[in-house]
């Protein structure tokens, strides 16, 4: 018996030692990881990640991930993220549109940069106005006499759009230029909510305000289908026209439709690369070795890199413009508009208003450019931003809005105080309408034997997700939504020198492209960010200026924690999706995207000016 007790005691003793060893090892590894991340970030902050070209060569435009107006603060340490998690982790990588454009423009005047090579295999896309803006910079580079080349084993639709701005496009002999058109799709939950016995109460104004349809339908309404088909067709035609002009071929040759594409592939025996070459989508078919040889002849050989001489976009040092005294403040509204402080990928009403206020109070800032790339969101937060922008204009500082890929619904609400609005022809804007959704689960609880009861001094004191929504509360909510809509169209009417009745005819939640918005008087001119800045300078009557970007600078500790937590947040869904078959992984990604949108809905009055179809555009 004593031997047995010794064995049991020994077993627990050694088990405890093993657990203690594992605990200490995990803590030590965590500490080492923390130190490495901190050192890596310190090196990047101190400029260790940038280097000048020591000799003449190409700028390698090897964009990895997506293009956004304003990357999340932790994304500025992208090199460290790529080193820790691999370049394929494009989920983690956000690239500043303006950094890319400024880099290309700096390279144009850099004697050590003799050309650009676009290697876009890890490029995950961006909205059409953003890529047009990059294309403009690439054209300026070409016009300076320096060549632009595009290389790729395959080209997705977004990758090919950028590649079309090149002097020459190479494609692998086994590659494909994958053109298929645009789509906007979303998930619809009505049947699911019915099965769960969830009661959905929808309040809206606007025939075309389709953001609530997922809660009350299992498919698109005819009105939403008609409206979305129109603007998505316009965007696709803009895509084809741009590529056709770049390649100097007819738009019908870029994409002849599904049937025409099938006939063309039949003639080439299914050889997608041959089809691309014969239809002048690319200039040459070549292997990696052949492309390397051609680029080496153009740019020279690097003994260190054992490749043609080039410097990555991520290593090329972007110079800070000189402080000329006067400045034009640039404030970003990038993402869904939320009440409160800014979160990753979303616009915080309080954060953005504070940035506008800082620009208003800075005597060196002579004008403000609000860069909007948002499908809208919280009405309360939108009004907070709008009011602060109106205060800046009232203080005598010109306000110009530059619309990016989207400036819809709440994104248009915050644009109304501007002296001048510049939109891209492919901007999605309008969507002037308001909605609210309240779900209650009293029937769900009842079906499993859970009931709610109590007393209250009025029906309004007993509003809860676990009880049926009182009729009085429903009527009050609808009145609030209708009042918000009247407020919206009145703001637009005052800003556009029109009447609420006239604005109502083009509102009702209707989405417009920038081109149509110009025709309807919702914007002042068509152009890009450069045009908006030039207009701001003109209104402020300044001859020399520099741009002052208003972004929240995180502390060093925040940078360390953001990289760590951001990496973990990104790796977990990636790891989960990696274990799923491809079709299920795609569904999981869609579900996560939908849940992220719902998480951004935090308006205290449950009122939203949000364009769901704009956010679903791809």
Swiss-Prot record:
Phenotype upon loss of function: No effect on processing of liberated signal peptides in vivo.
Membrane topology (UniProt): Single-pass membrane protein
Ranges in the topological domain labelled Periplasmic: 46-618
InterPro entries linked: ClpP/crotonase-like_dom_sf, Pept_S49_pIV, Pept_S49_SppA, Peptidase_S49, S49_SppA_1, S49_SppA_67K_type_N
GO MF: endopeptidase activity; serine-type peptidase activity
A GO biological-process term: signal peptide processing
GO cellular component: membrane; plasma membrane
Ranges per topology, Cytoplasmic: 1-24
Superkingdom assignment: Bacteria
Subcellular location: Cell inner membrane
Activity regulation info: Inhibited by serine hydrolase inhibitor FP-biotin and by antipain.
Impact upon substituting residue 510 to A: Reduced activity
Top-rank EC class of the record's enzyme: hydrolase
Impact after mutating residue 366 to A: Reduced activity
Gene3D superfamilies: 2-enoyl-CoA Hydratase, Chain A, domain 1, 6.20.330.10
Domain notes: A tandem duplication in the protein fold creates an intact active site between the repeated domains of each monomer.
Assembly and binders: Homotetramer.
Function according to Swiss-Prot or TrEMBL: Digests cleaved signal peptides in vitro, its in vivo function is unknown. This activity is necessary to maintain proper secretion of mature proteins across the membrane.
Family: Belongs to the peptidase S49 family.
PANTHER family on file: PEPTIDASE S49 DOMAIN-CONTAINING PROTEIN, PROTEASE 4
Name recorded for this polypeptide: Protease 4
Protein species of origin: Escherichia coli (strain K12)
